[in-house]
């Protein structure tokens, strides 16, 4: 083995070997265990969330594969409708070409060309992270098979009365000209205004105070052109007498009713609210309760129409309400209309006041434009009938959420579920399988030929397919079964569905998880007709945030690419990466400064195993993950530790009883074997419970502290002792080899590359059969090999050695200087342990002699420590220069007192505490605590030496 651990030298070649040998494919034996990769957008590259997700899924798959399960981890990518269309449009615009000039077919050809060029980027990154996915089964949501499944699902849901077309309010992106989902809307906190407007009462009505008008408060005065009512709270005494009366809508002259609704907060403004059902989601709900007309005043660009389109709640035209609008505003965009309408109110003496107001402004996450609630014809899934069985599946335990608290989030959304708008006004995506004749009648079918045959439509009847495509989440919702061949009854579908685990972030429980459950349970049935669930467990993790707990985003300049941590990146390239393509270029300087401060030397190459182990160690239940580069560095050191331990074992491990020769186990051998059983049980238990953090912690503790720090040291005296029986030396060599081999198998799901590399060299000595660690059996604890007596004896020995080590440290005695040791208050058990381990103790603690003092015997002037009730004494005569040591301690105490004074002064300075970021203050407080503790220890040490 190379002297130092070089991840790059081993990672790529091992992945190629595993893939070419087909080790990732299901082995065809054992109970099935399936995970479907949540498909990343084909447009993108993997971010830290994907890296985290992949580390967790691969740990599960490798763990279950080693347990003998027939594992399938299926990869794939999502066509990502809006994101992909925008990206390709921008590329074409840079060449001076618009998609409308190209036309639909040629534009789609361009997208497929682009997908062929760049679609492999994600696959390359997944490979680099060591993910053991079955590449032969890779899927894309626009593959032919998946497109057929999408059409089949749409047609079946339509036949079952669960898909319909209707005119409803949607999130409308005025730049992209499409409806978008709630997930694609970002609410931005902005400073805005609240306009208080005077609406005259009609028919001579008066308020309780004798006024002939109401004052309504609004953040969107331009929408008043579409007002259908003014609402007041039914309990508001000020307006009770006016309920059922009318106001005259200023500028428009339309009479609109005053209605009572609990939606109105009597404490907000004057307690009167204008209701515009066609341009506000809350108002739409009020409109439904009071059967108000819907007056659509905007076109698809959010420009004011010449006359409002007036509809009933069922989407039919309302011809009884006058939709006339003032000609002055026709064609104006909504913000220009706002200015002119406010000016007109002011000129008419109807503008009461304008107040500053904090707003939540909805913007499209792709276009950045302000989203307009807009009335339009769309396709919908009727979700309430689908939600009931999906709720029951979680209630009765067929699907479990881990952590369990996310079940409540799921239930609260599912019990208040709204119908799902599934159509998008895009070109890229699954085109809706619906056709219209010239009269506008709609026909749904798998293709045009089926539509014509089913409805007896001859060739003389022209049919036009719906131009819209389906919401990306619709095809993603079929992901677990469409990728296994549904609607055909394939062997893969029979074997691997339902899947076992979905690993996902909490932010898409509603948008993806819930919809997968609803669609799967309706469309996929067992032989007896009972519904199948898409997965048995949903493992929900938090967001991966930066070290300060901030969300990672391009605009914050704190995004990390997992592959930059794996392969390393120089500072200039990192700065360029973080500052290019910003939506807000003015942030570039700030981001550059921050990056140069945080990564002055760029990012070192840590390798995949260190990054994966970091992700697993941070995977505590449900909390957001604060990603810490210090942890990656620590786990890179862990890889080095394992590598160096393996070099020692391979060097010493020959003649370890691999041919059946007799062995004798030492106390240390029995102890480490016993500890191994406990670790096997603990790691397995925690992985079964999805506690990757605790499994990683148990593994780290065993390998670093018990095996490397203690057992390797305890093995040396046995191997050095020329008088030791050959069987005992062979027993220690065998234990060194076999315990490491088992530890490598335990670590493999977390750190696949380093474990494979070392295992290949160690396997012959350990008597392990097989070509790869991946397919080795998972270690199972053997309770018969737990040796409590050996554990107790070693803990006692460790206590004694640490006591001697501490005395050396406190008294500044060199580690190699032989010491005399005196022991007082020695029990019979202590005496036995001393006698049995005399050679071991003298070698490891560097002792010249050990003397047990009889009761009442005078001890020389010594530094002391306790091991249980036994007193450990190291005589100081001739070991230290008392004066020089006290002078050294005085100097160090003085330095620390200065540090305490400096940091304490900083923290008691109000100007510093008020202005400094919380993480800087926390750092200073930690410094102060550390300095105070060190000062206390030095003072104790000073007193001990002074008393000698």
Curated annotation (Swiss-Prot):
Coiled-coil ranges from the UniProt annotation: 879-945
Pfam family, one: Anticodon_1
CDD domains membership: Anticodon_Ia_Val, ValRS_core
The reaction(s) this protein catalyses: tRNA(Val) + L-valine + ATP = L-valyl-tRNA(Val) + AMP + diphosphate
One GO process term, biological-process aspect: valyl-tRNA aminoacylation
UniProt keywords, alphabetically: Aminoacyl-tRNA synthetase, ATP-binding, Coiled coil, Cytoplasm, Ligase, Nucleotide-binding, Protein biosynthesis
Subcellular location: Cytoplasm
Signal peptide: none
Motif ('KMSKS' region): 551-555
Record: residues binding ATP: 554
Molecular function as annotated in GO: aminoacyl-tRNA deacylase activity; ATP binding; valine-tRNA ligase activity
EC number: 6.1.1.9
Annotated motif 'HIGH' region, positions: 40-50
Protein family (similarity comment): Belongs to the class-I aminoacyl-tRNA synthetase family. ValS type 1 subfamily.
Role: Catalyzes the attachment of valine to tRNA(Val). As ValRS can inadvertently accommodate and process structurally similar amino acids such as threonine, to avoid such errors, it has a 'posttransfer' editing activity that hydrolyzes mischarged Thr-tRNA(Val) in a tRNA-dependent manner.
Notes on the domains: ValRS has two distinct active sites: one for aminoacylation and one for editing. The misactivated threonine is translocated from the active site to the editing site. The C-terminal coiled-coil domain is crucial for aminoacylation activity.
Protein's recorded name: Valine--tRNA ligase
Protein source organism: Pseudomonas savastanoi pv. phaseolicola (strain 1448A / Race 6)
């Amino acid at each position: 083995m190379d002297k130092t651990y070089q991840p790059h030298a081993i990672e790529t070649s091992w992945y190629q070997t595993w893939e070419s040998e087909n080790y990732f494919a299901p082995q065809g034996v054992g109970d099935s265990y399936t995970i479907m990769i949540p498909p990343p957008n084909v447009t993108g590259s993997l971010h830290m969330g994907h890296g985290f997700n992949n580390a967790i899924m691969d740990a599960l798959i490798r763990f279950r594969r080693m347990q003998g399960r027939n594992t399938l981890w299926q990869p794939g990518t999502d066509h990502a409708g809006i994101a992909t269309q925008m990206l390709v449009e921008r590329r074409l615009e840079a060449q001076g070409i618009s998609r409308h000039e190209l036309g639909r077919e040629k534009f789609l050809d361009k997208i497929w060309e682009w997908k062929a060029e760049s679609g492999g980027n994600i696959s390359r990154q997944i490979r680099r992270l060591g993910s053991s996915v079955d590449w032969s089964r890779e899927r894309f949501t626009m593959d032919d098979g998946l497109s057929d499944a999408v059409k089949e699902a749409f047609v079946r849901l339509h036949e079952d009365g669960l898909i319909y077309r209707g005119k409803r309010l949607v999130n409308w992106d005025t730049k992209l000209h499409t409806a978008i989902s709630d997930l694609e809307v970002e609410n931005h906190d902005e400073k805005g205004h609240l306009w208080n407007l005077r609406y005259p009462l009609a028919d001579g009505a008066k308020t309780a105070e004798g006024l002939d008008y109401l004052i309504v408060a609004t953040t969107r005065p331009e929408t008043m052109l579409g007002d259908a009512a003014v609402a007041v709270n039914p309990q508001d005494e000020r307006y009770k007498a006016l309920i059922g009366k009318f106001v005259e809508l200023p500028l428009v002259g339309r009479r609109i009713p005053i209605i009572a609704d609990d939606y109105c907060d009597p404490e907000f403004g004057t307690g009167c609210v204008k209701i515009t059902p066609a341009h506000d989601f809350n108002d739409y709900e009020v409109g439904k309760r009071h059967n108000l007309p819907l007056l659509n005043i905007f076109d698809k660009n959010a420009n004011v129409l010449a006359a409002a389109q007036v509809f009933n709640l069922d989407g039919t035209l309302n011809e009884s309400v006058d939709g006339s609008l003032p000609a002055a505003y026709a064609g104006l965009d909504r913000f220009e209309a706002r200015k002119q309408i406010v000016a007109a109110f002011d000129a008419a003496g109807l503008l009461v006041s304008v107040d500053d107001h904090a707003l939540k402004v909805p913007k499209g996450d792709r276009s950045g434009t302000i989203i307009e609630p807009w009335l339009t014809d769309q396709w919908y899934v009727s979700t309430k009938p689908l939600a009931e069985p999906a709720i029951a599946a979680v209630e009765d335990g067929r699907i479990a959420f881990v952590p369990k608290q996310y079940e409540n989030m799921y239930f609260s959304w599912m019990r208040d579920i709204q119908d799902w708008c599934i159509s998008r006004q895009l070109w890229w995506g699954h085109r809706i399988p619906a056709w219209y004749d010239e009269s506008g009648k709609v026909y749904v079918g798998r293709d045009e030929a089926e539509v014509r045959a089913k409805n007896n439509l001859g060739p003389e009847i022209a049919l036009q397919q719906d131009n819209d495509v389906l919401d990306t989440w619709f095809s993603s919702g079929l992901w677990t079964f469409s990728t296994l061949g549904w609607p055909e009854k394939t062997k893969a579908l029979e074997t691997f569905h339902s899947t076992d685990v979905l690993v996902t972030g909490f932010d898409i429980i509603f948008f993806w998880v819930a919809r997968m459950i609803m669609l799967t349970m309706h469309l996929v049935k067992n032989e007896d007709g009972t519904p199948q669930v898409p997965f048995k467990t949903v493992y929900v993790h938090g967001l991966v945030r930066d070290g300060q707990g901030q969300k990672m985003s391009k605009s914050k300049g704190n995004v990390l690419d997992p592959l930059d941590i794996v392969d390393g990146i120089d500072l200039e390239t990192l700065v360029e990466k973080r500052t290019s393509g910003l939506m807000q270029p003015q942030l570039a300087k700030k981001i550059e400064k921050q990056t140069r401060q945080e990564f002055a030397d760029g990012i070192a190459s840590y390798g995949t195993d260190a990054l994966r182990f970091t992700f697993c160690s941070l995977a505590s239940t449900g909390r957001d993950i604060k990603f810490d580069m210090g942890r990656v560095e620590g786990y890179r050191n862990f890889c080095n530790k394992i590598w160096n331990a393996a070099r020692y074992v391979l060097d010493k491990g020959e003649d370890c009883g691999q041919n059946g020769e007799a062995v004798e186990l030492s106390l240390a051998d029995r102890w480490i074997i016993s500890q191994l059983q406990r670790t096997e049980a603990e790691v397995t238990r925690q992985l079964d419970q999805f506690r990757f953090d605790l499994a990683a912690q148990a593994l780290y503790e065993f390998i670093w502290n018990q095996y490397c720090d203690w057992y390797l040291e305890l093995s040396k005296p046995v191997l050095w002792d020329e008088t030791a029986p050959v069987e005992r030396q062979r027993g220690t060599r065998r234990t060194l080899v076999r315990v490491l081999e088992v530890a490598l198998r335990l670590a493999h799901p977390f750190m696949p590359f380093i474990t494979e590399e070392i295992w290949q060299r160690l396997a012959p000595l350990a008597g392990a059969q097989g070509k790869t660690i991946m397919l080795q059996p998972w270690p199972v604890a053997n309770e018969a090999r737990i040796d409590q007596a050996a554990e107790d004896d070693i803990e006692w020995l460790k206590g004694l050695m640490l006591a001697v080590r501490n005395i050396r440290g406190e008294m500044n005695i060199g580690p190699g200087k032989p010491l005399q040791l005196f022991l007082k208050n020695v029990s019979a058990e202590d005496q036995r342990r001393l006698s049995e381990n005399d050679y071991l103790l003298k070698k490891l603690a560097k002792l010249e002699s050990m003397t047990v003092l009889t009761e009442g015997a005078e001890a020389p002037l010594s530094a002391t420590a306790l091991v249980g009730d036994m007193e450990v004494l190291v005589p100081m005569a001739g070991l230290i220069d008392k004066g020089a040591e006290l002078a050294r301690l005085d100097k160090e105490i003085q330095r620390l007192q200065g540090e305490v004074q400096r940091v304490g002064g900083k923290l008691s300075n109000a100007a510093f505490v008020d202005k400094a970021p919380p993480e800087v203050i926390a750092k200073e407080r930690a410094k102060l605590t550390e300095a105070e503790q060190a000062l206390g220890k030095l003072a104790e040490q000073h007193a001990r030496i002074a008393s000698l």
